[in-house]
A protein has these predicted regions:
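Active-site-proximal substrate-binding groove within the catalytic cores of carbohydrate-active enzymes
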Residues: 2-281
Length: 281
């Protein structure tokens, strides 16, 4: 692109109340210090990302795409204290919501990452939703309250199955909370990412995953189809490792996170590390 069309580090970023440009750094999750070897990055001003989003949505419609997604929309929210274009956090929310509505006006679905409450009304799909809490050892059990409120109204998924810490665990958590399955793939071999800062995609090569992906997705889709558009009416733990999620259409999803088979009081067998969907009489 022309020089005037690219990113301008003095014009496009948001500014702190001190008028300094918002330039951020990555920090270690282990020792909490700044990672000097990583490049810094800028936080775009709401006005700048609005212009980019409008242009992208227009072109997406032109090329006949089904939907769009921006990494930070609905997830990251910041004000801009630039004296010449001050934008408050509430105004930034309005700007993002206007963008969501613009995508609908252009017959485009909108997908967001993780997501905040203000974005829920106008988006179609949420990825990387936290399905199983923060895993603090002090917690006994977890209740998928957020998913209970949203299921049947919005589509959502947890972490990418192929990038998760344990594929089976990710699927079990999805079944418990009524989430969809989410995968992240790339065409090239993950070997090209060795000795880079993108090693989290260690298991993203589509050719390596194709058969497993198809099998996992078909099985999950067939099992969960009866409750896909239903609302959740109840969630309970039958023991420390087995949960039961009930839906308004009479179906129940039993999930066994343990390594021993479990039989319910009514005689339903829930195999270890598996889930079943059924109408319990």
């Amino acid at each position: 692109s022309d020089l005037s069309d690219g990113f301008n580090r003095y014009k496009d970023p948001a500014r702190f109340a001190s008028s300094e440009v918002v330039e951020l750094n990555e920090y270690s999750s282990i020792w909490y210090g700044k990672l000097e070897e990583r490049d810094s990055y800028f936080l775009l001003s709401p006005q700048s990302y609005l212009q980019c989003a409008d242009e992208f949505i227009t072109n997406a419609s032109k090329y006949g795409l089904d939907g769009v997604s921006f990494r930070d929309f609905g997830y990251q929210l910041a004000a801009d204290y630039n004296d010449k274009r001050h934008v408050s956090r509430s105004k930034a929310i309005d700007i993002q919501n206007d963008t969501f509505k613009s995508s609908k006006d252009n017959k485009l679905c909108f997908m967001i990452n993780a997501g905040n409450e203000y974005a829920l009304e106008n988006v179609d799909f949420i990825t990387n939703m936290t399905l199983h809490g923060n895993r603090y050892a002090i917690l006994d059990n977890l209740v998928p309250f957020y998913q209970i409120a949203l299921h049947g109204y919005k589509n959502y998924a947890g972490t990418a199955v192929n990038l998760g810490y344990e594929n089976d665990q990710v699927i079990l958590e999805a079944a418990e909370s009524g989430a969809g399955l989410y995968f992240v793939f790339m065409k090239e071999s993950e070997k090209i990412l060795q000795e880079t800062y993108y090693t989290e995609y260690y298991s993203a090569c589509f050719d390596d995953w194709k058969d497993r992906f198809v099998s996992m997705y078909k099985e999950y889709d067939n099992k969960m189809m009866p409750v896909m558009n239903s609302t959740i009416s109840n969630h309970e733990y039958l023991n420390n490792q087995v949960s039961c999620t009930s839906y308004d259409n009479g179906y129940k999803v039993f999930v066994n996170f343990g390594y021993v088979d479990y039989t319910t009081e009514s005689g339903v067998l829930v195999p270890a590390r598996d889930y079943i969907v059924m109408v319990e009489e």
